[in-house]
């Protein structure tokens, strides 16, 4: 199985980009980024090849007997849909990646109030590499199948100057805090509740294939305890919240 890559923070991307530029004698680049709401569920995927549909978690293949929050059972009822998706992509071997979200999977977020559903955010073809969500063909698609695509709601845009990423970090922080306050995906289905954050990938289709350039920004409620520094009172004032999150992003 092809695992979906882990996504780190912006600070890791800054380090990689600067190191690459310095080694090759290049100026630090300016890269346009597109952000999609990060869904707090469990990472999942479906590989379609040789007429088979193999569900997977981030770490292993799944079966109804060895499931992960019922995802394999869900896929067993959607086999024809996933096969059709692969046919529309003219792919002999393709894995659709997404987040399995909904009731009972995670707690304390807006989307936990929804019935369980699969939200696709990427695909992988061994020949073509990673495929962006907007390039996944969905002719005659119906959301009644409880299979969605991450671009069904608006995305976010930011330009990152890797010579001076602070202005971009400020913008990312504002977007992230807004998502945390009210999850846009929960709002789509008339539910209230907090969101987790945003996943950022290069807007350029070719750069987007490089997973080392992807990063995520999480709201304060989803930061690890050790990231909430003792000198910052997280729940006092908006100003302190923003500064704390900017610090964690950079």
Could you say what each language-model-derived stretch is?
Residues 1-250:
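Core nucleotide-handling region used for phosphoryl-transfer chemistry
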């Amino acid at each position: 199985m092809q695992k979906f890559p882990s996504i780190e923070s912006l600070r890791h991307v800054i380090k990689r980009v600067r190191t690459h530029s310095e080694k090759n004698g290049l100026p630090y680049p300016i890269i346009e980024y597109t952000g999609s709401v990060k869904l707090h569920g469990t990472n999942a995927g479906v590989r379609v090849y040789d007429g088979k549909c193999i569900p997977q978690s981030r770490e292993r293949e799944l079966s109804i007997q060895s499931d992960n929050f019922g995802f394999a059972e869900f896929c067993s009822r959607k086999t024809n849909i996933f096969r059709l998706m692969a046919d529309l992509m003219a792919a002999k071997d393709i894995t659709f990646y997404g987040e399995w979200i909904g009731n009972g999977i995670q707690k304390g977020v807006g989307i936990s109030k929804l019935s369980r559903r699969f939200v696709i955010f990427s695909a992988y073809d061994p020949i073509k590499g990673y495929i962006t969500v907007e390039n996944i063909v969905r002719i005659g698609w119906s959301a009644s199948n409880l299979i969605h695509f991450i671009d069904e709601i608006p995305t976010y845009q930011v330009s990152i100057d890797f010579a001076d990423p602070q202005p971009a970090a400020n913008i990312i922080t504002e977007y992230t805090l807004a998502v945390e306050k009210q999850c846009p995906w929960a709002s789509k289905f008339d539910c209230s509740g907090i969101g987790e954050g945003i996943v950022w990938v290069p807007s350029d289709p070719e750069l987007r294939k490089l997973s080392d350039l992807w990063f995520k920004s999480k709201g304060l409620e989803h930061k690890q305890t050790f990231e909430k520094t003792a000198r910052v009172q997280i729940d006092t004032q908006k100003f302190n919240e923003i500064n704390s999150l900017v610090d964690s992003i950079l």
